[in-house]
Amino acid sequence: MEEHSYIQKELDLQNGSLEEDSVVHSVENDSQNMMESLSPKKYSSSLRFKANGDYSGSYLTLSQPVPAKRSPSPLGTSVRSSPSLAKIQGSKQFSYDGTDKNIPMKPPTPLLNTTSSLSGYPLGRADFDHYTGRDSERALRLSEKPPYSKYSSRHKSHDNVYSLGGLEGRKASGSLLAMWNGSSLSDAGPPPISRSGAASMPSSPKQARKMSIQDSLALQPKLTRHKELASENINLRTRKYSSSSLSHMGAYSRSLPRLYRATENQLTPLSLPPRNSLGNSKRTKLGEKDLPHSVIDNDNYLNFSSLSSGALPYKTSASEGNPYVSSTLSVPASPRVARKMLLASTSSCASDDFDQASYVGTNPSHSLLAGESDRVFATRRNFSCGSVEFDEADLESLRQASGTPQPALRERKSSISSISGRDDLMDYHRRQREERLREQEMERLERQRLETILSLCAEYTKPDSRLSTGTTVEDVQKINKELEKLQLSDEESVFEEALMSPDTRYRCHRKDSLPDADLASCGSLSQSSASFFTPRSTRNDELLSDLTRTPPPPSSTFPKASSESSYLSILPKTPEGISEEQRSQELAAMEETRIVILNNLEELKQKIKDINDQMDESFRELDMECALLDGEQKSETTELMKEKEILDHLNRKIAELEKNIVGEKTKEKVKLDAEREKLERLQELYSEQKTQLDNCPESMREQLQQQLKRDADLLDVESKHFEDLEFQQLEHESRLDEEKENLTQQLLREVAEYQRNIVSRKEKISALKKQANHIVQQAQREQDHFVKEKNNLIMMLQREKENLCNLEKKYSSLSGGKGFPVNPNTLKEGYISVNEINEPCGNSTNLSPSTQFPADADAVATEPATAVLASQPQSKEHFRSLEERKKQHKEGLYLSDTLPRKKTTSSISPHFSSATMGRSITPKAHLPLGQSNSCGSVLPPSLAAMAKDSESRRMLRGYNHQQMSEGHRQKSEFYNRTASESNVYLNSFHYPDHSYKDQAFDTLSLDSSDSMETSISACSPDNISSASTSNIARIEEMERLLKQAHAEKTRLLESREREMEAKKRALEEEKRRREILEKRLQEETSQRQKLIEKEVKIRERQRAQARPLTRYLPVRKEDFDLRSHVETAGHNIDTCYHVSITEKTCRGFLIKMGGKIKTWKKRWFVFDRNKRTFSYYADKHETKLKGVIYFQAIEEVYYDHLKNANKSPNPLLTFSVKTHDRIYYMVAPSPEAMRIWMDVIVTGAEGYTHFLL
């Protein structure tokens, strides 16, 4: 609201100030603009290849330059008014003031009037310096940048049309949303404010409607006054709007433009040419019946009226008759083509040229033909400052018309306002964001490539920066590859390079890397740099080819780069009339380069051989590891099978135990059934005798009674025996059940333990299988890596051979058909340090001295002598060295090319640096090459590290002594074979004899894997025969000493191996002894545990047998409370009225079977703990005592489950009281009374005292 009030206040102030002198200022501005338009000016701008979301080709970009005729005559000349641009201090924001001074202008308005030379691209600061004088007043008004500017990096999205300037433009245009919805503004007249610019349909119609209402309210009081001012100025002049008047907002347009009703005061702002130039045949195939009749004219041109925040041009008859206007609507068939056109647009030069072409086209003397118009429009598609871009649906639905009013509404397709759902909107935003990110990446890579090329150009002129050009060239090549991946098609570069002038291209590439202050000097630099910046495809190739002519620093790690650089550096670049001295220098340089290439060849061969050895070693290790894992897996599988067998045995044992117990129970039951049958027979016999006794005569009654008495006694004895047997059978069954339970639990524990062991072994076997698979896969990966590295080395070897062949051809061409000499003295070693070359040459200013090489043989840097020979003057000592070498060559001191090469230095300075097995050796007067790192003559450190690594892995994995000794033997053989196969030549021809004995064996070491014996053994007799006799004697002495050293070394290794073997044997013996002791200890512990468990089980079994089958033991305490004891047992005494219990007594009726005569009679029983008797009476008065049972006679009380009671009134309520003499059968009146009596009587069953412990 504050911002709105500020804008309204400024509008009122300017209206008041401009009303007075509006006519005078408008006349002055018209004349001044005419003069400026007649003066030819070429506006230069800097094009940034900006492919981010700000200028995304997938959005609709509207360009609306409108030609306006000064007179209604068709022959009138269209005068183009140049835009007025103000240079704003502190930023690159320029504004175009396309309005008269009598029309009110608000401060933020220049945001919409800001122009650029190309599709909304910011203009260079130096390109518009000539406008600052006239527009200083306007620059003061524009010095304050709106907070929501399109130049702000935070607000570059499709909603940026609602910046402050956009709000002002919308207020100026009146209620345009009502026009869009179908309403009319005919009563309001033409809009009062005339501005140039473009805006888009807002993303949210609701927000646009809200803002439009505010606009109409804000502009209502001033409508009449503006109408009068507009009518006064309409006859003074009409403005011709430049082609970039709509470029800013058009570049940010994210939807279709707003439509409005064409009134009589409005000119159709924009016309579209046919799509023939784009090659789209759909345009011509579609019938005109697809569009309304009011849209199509005779020339098939589509009149697309657009009014948003821009000015409404005044309609004249001349403008209606001209079907061509200075701006076209380029409608690409897809966002891909739109992006291509946006990237291909170059500079404002093309825009101005096209404006001139449009100007010529409107002139009657320069009318455009059909072919010319196509060419102009095709050019415009690539050079247009603000081309409107539609998608495929809009292209097929559009037609051109001129001179006819457009309908009130127009169907909108594929725009953001036509999106109906949230998912469509999110997809629309996602596509635009991905496009912006991709184009930002293209911009970044392009800028990085250009900056790298410019830095290369800056370093190219410096002689000291030759060493860093190689990596920069690689950076350029890498950036070019990434750009090729991101480029849309080959047509983009064709459009871009074919249509871009060298001057424009240079300024485009230099814009991002130069500061703003340097932009003014781009015009002068463009002429000198036009010849350098050719199109991209040829420009980069020429630049890279020039840069590769400078030799990069050679390195043994990259033999190809070293050899190629040295080969390129020695190519003759002098005219044919060179002197003999220069030719000889070039030939010598070629010889040195040949030595480097030969050394590289030998090194590559050695590396290939080392890789083969590593592959063999990897195979051997894989076999050994797989064999170990296989053996361990087999042992685990065997143990697993054993444990499974033990588990099956335990299961069988459990089944057998169950079966045995069932058999025992069956036997006892059969025995008990036999005793029961016998007892039943005796009872039947006794019953028969009783019946006979009743029927027998008196004479036989006495005899029968005696017999009946004997039978009764026998029956009583048998019944007691049966009861005892039954009791024993029950005890036996309980004991069997207990044993079964204990044994079953033990067996189940063992079963569970073995099952856990089986599961763990299965997991271990699975882990072993996974480990074996992992080892095989790892070995396969290593093998693939070795094969890849070997292939790379073979390719490098082939390149070196090709370089050598090319070098020999060049040497032959320079030397007149002669080949390379075979003199060994001319074949210098490639591993020469820089100070070694600088000392004989006497000049060490350009190159830094190097006194020590790295230890790694693969990383030893080789310095070709060519660069030094070409850049440094030759000294007298060097010429003397050359003369000595020529003399030796004439004397025949040379070897064949197949023999090893030696390193020869000048006789003045024989010192050199050497690296042997990772140790730096100080320069010495004499050092055999057997200890130098030439041609891979020593074991590479990578092989030694590989051997040590494999040995440590074997020791960690616990290999036995045989495997260790075998590994040592193979390693020693591998070392000897590697050293003996290396090519070494003994340098013994140019050194004095007095220094031999002092310094010959300075580098000899027993720890080194290299040996002088193997190095010298490679020398053939031909090598030695050319030396003197003293040299032969020296060599023989050396061989003898080396043999002794080698024997000593072998002896030390053997003694060390024997010591390790003894230690390992002792360790294994100790380990075996400890395992035996641990096993014995475990066995004894398990045996002891078993004995303890067995004793405990025996004691528990005895204690269980001491307890009788009765429920409670007798109680003999004096303070025993019988009533509380019964209640504690769970009985409810109060509800059982058949029994009366006190603390010491229990009374109640029971039915008792007689002893002699088996009759059942009801008796009153009294259990008295004071008298310690269980007596029964005839009635409850306790007067007539019928019998007494003492506590000492009661043995046990139990329920009559065998139904032994004869003719019991109620067998279910019958229980027995066993004494020493007889068994009393009693029947309780109720079940609760029976349970209470049994618990009471058992407390006095003191006949069980012998079972107590």
From Swiss-Prot:
Identify the InterPro entries for this entry: PH-like_dom_sf, PH-like_domain, PH_domain, PHLDB1/2/3_PH
In the record, Phosphoserine modifications are located at 71, 73, 157, 204, 212, 242, 245, 330, 334, 348, 351, 384, 387, 415, 420, 468, 489, 501, 513
Q: Which residues form the PH domain?
A: 1143-1246
Coiled coil region boundaries: 584-696, 722-807, 1032-1098
Q: Any keyword Coiled coil?
A: yes
Q: Where is the composition biased (Basic and acidic residues)?
A: 1-12, 126-144
This protein's UniProt keywords: Cell junction, Cell projection, Coiled coil, Cytoplasm, Membrane, Phosphoprotein
Q: Which PROSITE patterns match?
A: PH_DOMAIN (PS50003)
A GO cellular-component term linked to this record: podosome
Q: For the modification Phosphothreonine, which residues carry it?
A: T504, T550, T574, T898
Q: What is its main location?
A: cytoplasm
Disordered: annotated segments? 1-43, 60-159, 187-212, 265-286, 525-567
Give residue spans, biased composition: Polar residues: 29-43, 74-96
User: What processes does the entry annotate via GO biological process terms?
Assistant: basement membrane organization; cell migration; establishment of cell polarity; establishment of protein localization; microtubule cytoskeleton organization; negative regulation of focal adhesion assembly; negative regulation of stress fiber assembly; negative regulation of wound healing, spreading of epidermal cells
Recall the GO molecular function terms of this protein's record: cadherin binding
Provide the assembly information: Interacts with FLNC. Interacts with AMOTL2; interaction may facilitate PHLDB2 localization to the myotube podosome cortex that surrounds the core. Part of a cortical microtubule stabilization complex (CMSC) composed of KANK1, PPFIA1, PPFIBP1, ERC1/ELKS, PHLDB2/LL5beta, CLASPs, KIF21A and possibly additional interactors; within CMSCs KANK1 and PHLDB2/LL5beta appear to be the core components for targeting of microtubule-binding proteins KIF21A and CLASPs, whereas PPFIA1, PPFIBP1 and ERC1/ELKS serve as scaffolds for protein clustering.
Q: What does this protein do?
A: Seems to be involved in the assembly of the postsynaptic apparatus. May play a role in acetyl-choline receptor (AChR) aggregation in the postsynaptic membrane.
About its domains, the entry says: The PH domain mediates the binding to phosphoinositides.
Recorded hits in PANTHER family, A to Z, give: PLECKSTRIN HOMOLOGY-LIKE DOMAIN FAMILY B MEMBER 2, PLECKSTRIN HOMOLOGY-LIKE DOMAIN, FAMILY B, MEMBER 3
What's the protein here called? Pleckstrin homology-like domain family B member 2
Query: Gene encoding it?
Result: PHLDB2
